[in-house]
Amino acid sequence: MYLKEGCSLLLKVQKPLIPFVLNTNLNVNHLLTESPNHAEIKELDVVKRLRQESCVPLALHFFKSIANSNLFKHTPLTFEVMIRKLAMDGQVDSVQYLLQQMKLQGFHCSEDLFISVISVYRQVGLAERAVEMFYRIKEFGCDPSVKIYNHVLDTLLGENRIQMIYMVYRDMKRDGFEPNVFTYNVLLKALCKNNKVDGAKKLLVEMSNKGCCPDAVSYTTVISSMCEVGLVKEGRELAERFEPVVSVYNALINGLCKEHDYKGAFELMREMVEKGISPNVISYSTLINVLCNSGQIELAFSFLTQMLKRGCHPNIYTLSSLVKGCFLRGTTFDALDLWNQMIRGFGLQPNVVAYNTLVQGFCSHGNIVKAVSVFSHMEEIGCSPNIRTYGSLINGFAKRGSLDGAVYIWNKMLTSGCCPNVVVYTNMVEALCRHSKFKEAESLIEIMSKENCAPSVPTFNAFIKGLCDAGRLDWAEKVFRQMEQQHRCPPNIVTYNELLDGLAKANRIEEAYGLTREIFMRGVEWSSSTYNTLLHGSCNAGLPGIALQLVGKMMVDGKSPDEITMNMIILAYCKQGKAERAAQMLDLVSCGRRKWRPDVISYTNVIWGLCRSNCREDGVILLERMISAGIVPSIATWSVLINCFILDDIVRAHDQFTI
């Protein structure tokens, strides 16, 4: 969907088909051996010319020309060289054609050449064609071997064709071929890729029983998979059965980090060093990445220092993690300075992942100009932006409120041939909703389904939020019903919260509480936002008693109140005329050990409640306490007190006049 101010519909452009052989009239006489007697052209000369020619179409033209000249008859070797060249270029049909020519001329295909043919099918993602070719192997005068079977299995693994892997493996055993460690490793990867960890562990035992000793790849594959599904402890037990290697340690460190067991990961790193196993760049980068993600940037830099002391140079992923950590800490300047130092100091070549870290970082800090500058630089140096690059920029423009910018990046993305995914579609829906272009947003969601990119719950949440914020509640409720009925997308608590917020803001509090019954019937767990939204709505609707009942339910449900909840409780007490109780709540929060403290809203609400209860002196005392606590009064705070004193003076004047 190309977008402009009117948001026109998507125009999909099919890529032109390129013929596999270029039919040219190029003069390739200079490639022929300049011999006075062309009949003396030798196999060695032809092979040399074919290998030296970097242009595949020219090499193929030479191959055909020399055959048509009757000066040379191609041999198995010249066929093999040409087929390998075409295979490396991914020209499947040309490879197939020359194989057929070899067969017609009675030449046998060697094992290595057949493996090259299988490899070209893998390269272009045609695993089934590779299997079909394999089962015709004898037509080309080549016998199956363990090596060929292994390459077929590996090709199938590349496309995760697990059923076909089992079928080919069964035929391999039927034909009397004993699997080797490479065969088993392919099978282990297939099992682990499909979360069949128990099967992989059994296969390890089978390997040993058959005298095929598992290698580092075997154990690393299984232990990595175990860590992925949370079986880190079991993975460590398995690792203790054999000589440890760095790749296994890396898998375990990664598993411990995913479980947030950083202490265990550090201890494992120490154990590696004690056993004489040097941590590599993956070991350090894994730890640095999790430390940066958790905001422990200083500790991450200490690991970088340790890494450099041990002579282990960082790679581009180490750099990306550290730059991301700087952005998360809010130090944009440090992030850019670190980037420049490491690029120059270590000669690192940034890739799209590294550039995306910069783009995302700048966008998250609202510096869209810098983000676009990085994007332009990527295009200039030939580093193609990917879907994450475009998604970050669209989201950055959307958050900044620039629909034109988001549309510009959207159209650049489509022009480049990069198809949007559900996240980018959702970002664009959000951008359109921010500018009240709800028809266009609805149209985009319809297009998603047609493009086989089903809208997700967050997509509908963005649309519903936009509608609710604009007061289009009836439309929002219609979308809410459609998302499940038409798109089979059940709402989550965020969806309900957006609707509750819309209803509460429209003072339709009864409908909001009616919606909570549906939430209960569906068994959807309430979040803190659910309670806070209803608390706010109840207070604004003049129902402080119901708001306080909600707090009781919140406690029973085991939800911890946050600063928003406490401010709502204080407001509810004040609206009930219980300002003293609200002040006690303020004292309780101030003395507690919670992570948060009363803010300007908390104090202002209590001051308002005290003034409302004719306790203006207490309000002034609370103001002084607020200032001494380092909290700056807002305009609302001063307005409450000024209005209180003005009203009191008016009342006094009225009383004196009446007397």
Curated annotation (Swiss-Prot):
- GO CC terms of this entry: mitochondrion
Which Pfam family, giving just one, matches this sequence?
PPR
The parts of the chain that form a coiled coil are none
Q: Does the keyword Repeat apply?
A: yes
Please tell me whether the keyword S-adenosyl-L-methionine is annotated for this protein: no
Q: Mind listing the UniProt keywords for this protein, alphabetically?
A: Repeat
Task: List the Gene3D superfamilies hit by this protein, alphabetically.
Answer: Tetratricopeptide repeat domain (1.25.40.10)
Determine the domain of life of the protein's source.
Answer: Eukaryota
Stored PROSITE patterns: PPR
User: Which cystines does this chain contain?
Assistant: none
PPR repeat residues: 75-109, 110-144, 145-179, 180-214, 215-243, 245-279, 280-314, 315-350, 351-385, 386-420, 421-455, 456-490, 492-526, 527-561, 562-598, 599-633
InterPro entries linked to this entry: Pentatricopeptide_rpt, TPR-like_helical_dom_sf
Q: Name one GO biological process term.
A: RNA splicing
Family named by the database record: Belongs to the PPR family. P subfamily.
| Protein's name in the database | Pentatricopeptide repeat-containing protein At3g48810
